[in-house]
């Protein structure tokens, strides 16, 4: 298996900062925002966006954690371990994930979040968009576009789990 680093730690940080600035620019009332991190790495990215919003706007935005596994249409798995401690009704919910691929995880996340209320709007922020959509889902905020073949895989590593921030691309040899 061939593995290559395509995004380093500094570029990951810059991508998250860029996403944060775009969120600030595109949302009139930042107090209505709820960041919904999709487990597992999407939660870490959501917390980093939350930190940047605090630094840049002195604003405390809530972060909720979404478990998409019980809502998947391709793989069913156990109980819902989501942590949604905020009423999302009439809020601007921004789903946050590490990689956007087929769109099935995002569809499951939408199914999950609407079970917790009726958001005014749901948008999507992803660190990496790799293409190959199977559903009509498009990200609103993108850190990096990395076109891939279907035989390749994108691996996002985050310091909280993997001891470093980077994005790898792997391909079966």
Curated annotation (Swiss-Prot):
- Catalysed reaction equations from the record: UMP + diphosphate = 5-phospho-alpha-D-ribose 1-diphosphate + uracil
Protein's recorded name: Bifunctional protein PyrR
Choose any GO biological process term that the UniProt entry carries and state it. DNA-templated transcription termination
Q: Which family does it belong to?
A: Belongs to the purine/pyrimidine phosphoribosyltransferase family. PyrR subfamily.
Q: One Pfam family from the UniProt entry?
A: Pribosyltran
Q: Which controlled-vocabulary keywords does the entry list?
A: Glycosyltransferase, RNA-binding, Transcription, Transcription regulation, Transcription termination, Transferase
Gene3D superfamilies (UniProt xref): 3.40.50.2020
Source organism of the structure: Streptococcus pneumoniae serotype 4 (strain ATCC BAA-334 / TIGR4)
Recorded GO MF terms: RNA binding; uracil phosphoribosyltransferase activity
Record function comment: Regulates transcriptional attenuation of the pyrimidine nucleotide (pyr) operon by binding in a uridine-dependent manner to specific sites on pyr mRNA. This disrupts an antiterminator hairpin in the RNA and favors formation of a downstream transcription terminator, leading to a reduced expression of downstream genes. Also displays a weak uracil phosphoribosyltransferase activity which is not physiologically significant.
InterPro entries tied to this protein: PRibTrfase_dom, PRTase-like, PyrR, PyrR_bifunctional
- Per the Swiss-Prot or TrEMBL annotation, the motif PRPP-binding is positioned at 93-105
Known EC number: 2.4.2.9
Q: How does it assemble?
A: Homodimer and homohexamer; in equilibrium.
CDD domains named among the record's database cross-references: PRTases_typeI
The coiled-coil segments of this chain are none
- What class does this enzyme belong to in the EC scheme? transferase
Binding residues annotated for substrate, in chain numbering = 40-41, 97-105, 130
Keyword NADP in record:
no
